[in-house]
Design a protein with these regions (language model features):
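Secondary-structure junction motif
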Residues: 106-108, 185-186, 194-218, 285-287, ...
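Alpha-helical linker/hinge and terminal dimerization helices associated
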Residues: 7, 43-44, 65-87, 100
Length: 302
């Protein structure tokens, strides 16, 4: 008989990339993990994983089984949360993810603060994640809502994705950089010789992907710096002189004092922020979405 624990362990092994990392994340011994997966395979009657010396691969049966196992676990978590929310009569927990390039300042902060003031029985749990990871966790029930940067590379049919506003992109650079002395906006083509502290990941969209699109439109691909970051720590790398980056204007609010910001000459130098949530989610999530879309201050959309 297949158990939920076996499903959970199987999915975690695949998403973690192997038994060792999954065991660390689950706080169980690898031997126990292996035993549960073998029992799952015995119950199904066919192998789901190929165990190599360094990595684990899905068999054809495993590839067919994985999305259904993920969906089952996500549906179970959604059902559990819905029952708890109904029983708590307006009280509950909302798990909100946000990209590192979507700092919760200004209008976003005001909207969150306003929601919590109206819904005094609700708690928010905030997690900083990449746009693509947010979508995966939303689809699988590990997050309730996500604030992310477009574009995203994967479409999830079970998710709503609502663009909220466009935000100007600025050139972030060290205060002593020669370009920081300019008064006129900087053309993207002038950055062809610069090194960038954030470049696209092959399997992620978001801000770095959008920045690379703009650079390609100006005739070059961003040259990687020797020190790279996909988090807000890129501002510290810029401050240290490792390179430059295209960042949203809202990141000025969290930047070190030795980082300067320059306007870009191109009208298309902007990035979009979006809100994501599951289509079949709970009244608590739907209530948050309705409030958030109606009460996001205008300055967040400028």
């Amino acid at each position: 008989m297949i158990s939920l624990r076996q499903l959970h362990y199987f999915v975690e092994i695949v998403e973690s990339g192997g038994f060792s990392r999954a065991a660390e994340r689950l706080f169980v011994a690898q031997s126990a993990l292996s035993r549960q997966v073998r029992e799952l395979e015995d119950s199904i009657g066919t192998p789901l994983l190929r165990r190599g010396p360094r990595q684990v691969e899905l068999t054809p049966a495993g590839r067919a089984f994985l999305p259904r196992a993920q969906r089952l676990l996500g549906d179970l978590e959604a059902a559990r949360r819905l029952a708890r929310e109904v029983g708590e009569d307006g009280h509950g927990l909302l798990r909100l993810g946000h990209s590192s390039s979507v700092p919760l300042v200004g209008g976003l902060q005001a909207a969150l603060r306003g929601y919590l003031a109206v819904q005094s029985g609700v708690r928010l749990e905030l997690t900083q994640q990449s746009s693509e990871q947010q979508l995966a966790d939303l689809a699988e029930g590990r997050l309730d809502l996500g604030l992310l940067r477009l574009p995203v590379l994967r479409q999830h049919p079970r998710l709503h994705l609502r663009a909220l506003y466009r935000e100007p992109l600025l050139l972030a650079l060290a205060a002593d950089h020669p370009l920081a002395r300019r008064e006129a906006p900087v053309a993207l083509a002038a950055l062809a010789g610069e090194t960038f502290v954030s470049i696209p990941h092959l399997q992620r969209g978001g801000l770095s992907y959008r920045a690379a699109e703009l650079c390609l439109g100006a005739g070059f691909y961003p040259r990687p710096a020797r020190a790279l970051s996909r988090k807000t720590s890129q501002l510290q790398l810029i401050e240290a002189g490792f390179g430059v980056a295209l960042v949203p204007a809202s990141m000025r609010a969290i930047a070190p004092p030795a980082v300067s910001f320059m306007s870009l000459a191109e009208a298309e130098a902007y990035s979009e922020v979006a809100l994501a949530w599951r289509r079949d989610d709970s009244p608590l999530v739907e209530g948050f979405v309705e409030y958030f879309l109606e009460n996001l201050p205008n300055e967040a959309k400028d």
